[in-house]
Amino acid sequence: MKKVTLILVLFLGFIPMLNAQWTSPGNGTTYTMSELVNVTDGVVTFDATNYHIHADLTISQNDVLKIDNGFQKIFVENALVTILGSMICENANRVSVMGDPSFSMRFENATNCDLKKLYFSDGAGIKLIESDVHFDDVKFVYFTTEYCHSAIDIFNCNPVIENCYFLLNEGAAIGSPANGQSSPKILNCEFDSNVNGANIPQINLGPGSEDTIFVVGNLIDGTYAQFHTGGISIADLMGTGDTKILLKDNIIKNNRYGYNQQGYHLNSTIVGNQFIDNYHEDNPMNGGSGISIYGMDDNNRAVIRDNVITGNLWGITAINGFDINLGTEEDWGNNQIHDNGNSGVVYDLYDNSTCDIMAVGNDWGTTDEQEIEDHIYHQYDDPGLGLVTFIPFVGYDAIEETNTALFEVSPNPAHGRFTVEGQGKMTITNALGQIVLTKDIDGQEYIALPRGLYVVRLGDATQKVIVD
């Protein structure tokens, strides 16, 4: 009886060893899944159809994990797969990596990692630590936040994430922390209703590195989120770096808000995007902007061109300190900003600071100057706020100037008053064609008019003048 008991104890003690973690030797070996079955002492197995990873697996520095086309699925049983070397997945067919019930991955100081045509589902998160991993045509579905805050957590690296799809993940799809510097390239991806039950955007980035953060050609849609999620946020709240951002050709719709840029030393170019129907916020004081620029000082910069901003609770909100360029006389903004608002009031642009904003050459959905003025909240509503210069705007440039050498208007633009120098009958009309002044002049005449665009006619000559 004692002999039987001893044998049973020895046998039971041996079972955990079959699934103990395995680490590659770091001698430059390239491993396929089938080769791992032969060398990992039961950590990796094959059941004639699919591969299974039963315990933690580490690919050491100098070694390579290569995923080939010889199978379709890998089931990972609550294990951590760590890549310290390289991982290559250049598949013609899609390979699924599925949690059974969950898994996590960690790339740390990894090099030459190229992942294509993978389908990750039911994971607990993928961490990239100083590892410039390339993801191309990869799907990330049903990730939890058990291992990290996002489906992909980035720390001090510049990965390329292109042609990828993120669906119904519990946390953000892609995130980086406030205490690191990372500049991912996020290109032509689709983000569909990520984040469940938290005030977090689908793309949630901290400070950038020396490289530019690229967010280009993506669809960020929050339509089916159980609790409405934000679109994109890029923030440097501690003044860590000097972040450069290109936000271009994205469609950002049906989120709690569209794009948030917040903190110190952020410099963005925002061009060719669509910020549409980002109104899923019960309290407008807590969000709902198509674009929100919240600066700690005027080193929070944004050049905003050729965007469509409509259907949001607020079109553009500008808060505290910033340097925002929405269009100048020399370089018109050409943004379409209209039909944004809440509580029965239209708010296409809200300047909640002492900073002035140039917003020349935009389409506000109307050519009625007073209507545009009513849709912009700034110094004319509260003398303590900055001034928004929005004239001329799209629709104002239909008036042609003629024979401008016959008389002189100066300064132009003018601040409250200007002079007309010439001889003859002078007629001044506003942008609606209404006559505001008629007078015979001989020499220099001083004119004071309210803010707006005016047409000065003297005989057969015509000139436009802007009063701001």
Predicted regions and their residues:
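Short, Lys/Arg-enriched, disordered terminal segments
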Residues: M1-V4, I376-Y377, D468
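Terminal non-domain segments
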Residues: K2-I7, L167-E170, K253-N255, H265, ...
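Bacterial Sec-dependent N-terminal signal peptides
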Residues: M1-S24, E400-T402, G459
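C-terminal outer-membrane/trafficking sorting elements
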Residues: N403-S410, A414-D468
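Low-complexity, Pro/Thr/Ser/Gly/Ala-rich linker/spacer regions in secreted
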Residues: P392-L406
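Generic detector of N-terminal low-structure segments
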Residues: G13-P16, N109, V409, V420
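Extracellular beta-rich repeat passengers
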Residues: Q21-Y396
